[in-house]
Amino acid sequence: MEKEKVKLDEVLKFLFSTSNKVLVKLLNGIFNENFSVDEVELTVSNNEFVEDDLGILRGDMFFDILNKDYNKASYHIEFQTKNDNTMIVRMFEYGFKKGKEQLKSFKNYTEDIRTIYFPKQKVIFFEENKNIKNQLKLKIIFPDEKEIIYTVDVMKYWEYSDEQVREKKMYPLIPLQLFKLRKELEKAHNKKDLNRIKELSNNAKELAGKLAKQSAILFEADEILGEDFHKMLLAIQNLIEYLNRNYMNDENIENEVTTMTKTLYDPEVEKRGIEKGREEGIEEGINLTKKVFKLASQGETIGNISKICKISEEKVKEILD
């Protein structure tokens, strides 16, 4: 696997562990939804599927959104640094595997027809490439010559400025603006163009400062929690470290960016974030109890309630008692 893909995966996995408040807004921005943070419950769902040869098919991110009526919508996001002609086939595999996995929880089907629901899917490409279209398409032809065209929408991240990312409230993607410098840095590095590398190094430092300050403003405006703010600053540091050690070799930039982010990060932020998390935990407990009782009143078994709510059967019994 390419080193930039590995680093991007690491950073994105970290950023996608931000609070549910932030992740709901992120999904709204990516999929043009309009979920209210206070009216839905978001969970990160399984992203690993066992294949027939016992190998593991692993996707990037899967989410489930449950509204106040307990209707569920599923979402799937894949991240790509470069164009890949096999991506659409993998998206079909991921979607089918997730649909098959969720089939077990559906009870409303006729004896002779089963229904598999694909999640809403999107591929986010981070580096510019003129060959990347707005949609990925796969034609599937059955033996009777019936055809279907399976499509997945694409988000071209390089087309978004930091202001546009912020306006769409895709806050965890803000630090990834730094990754947009990678391609130019690689060109300058390969050409051994020291002047261009120095210029891009200065650009990276300035951009890191700008993104960190934007994150601080979001925290002050209560758009993100303290834990989210902390993770965004750490992602900025991590990306600067990656760019520097692979392309820039600037002996000062890592320390300068780390110092800058520390001056923005109030030690009380973490404490406030934990306190708010406890308050949210109480509210989540109340909502869980309501959900368990409603499912029980609808005739769901303890086993099914356990699977739907993602809690143990013992916990279900404890709530119902």
Kindly give the residue locations of the regions a language model identified.
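Conserved single-residue anchors adjacent to enzymatic active/cofactor-binding motifs
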Residues: 1-250
